[in-house]
């Protein structure tokens, strides 16, 4: 799970930098829970981890609101994580 979290968080950061959103958010990272989900790998079903992406903005770190990222950015993050991180079948975005 730690490997998945590190790899997915790296992709989140890379995609936020590529899209110009990196300096506009307070925190952005991946979370890997214990649940598994069925996805498709190639032409076969595959059981794998669910990665949740959290991207938030905050002024004083007392409260945080989710960032309304453009769909294209979310799609790029999701596609890269499911294609590049071994063992991941689903990517979700957390709306606080």
Predicted regions and their residues:
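ATP/NTP-dependent adenylation/nucleotidyl-transfer catalytic domains that generate, transfer
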Residues: 1-96
């Amino acid at each position: 799970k730690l490997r998945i979290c590190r790899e997915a968080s790296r992709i989140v950061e890379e995609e936020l930098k590529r899209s110009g959103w990196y300096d506009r958010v307070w925190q952005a990272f991946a979370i890997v829970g214990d649940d598994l989900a069925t996805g498709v790998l190639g032409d076969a079903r595959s059981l794998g981890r669910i990665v949740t992406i959290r991207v938030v903005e905050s002024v004083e770190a007392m409260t945080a609101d989710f960032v309304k990222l453009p769909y294209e950015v979310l799609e790029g993050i999701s596609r890269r994580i499911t294609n590049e991180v071994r063992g991941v079948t689903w990517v979700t975005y957390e709306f606080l």
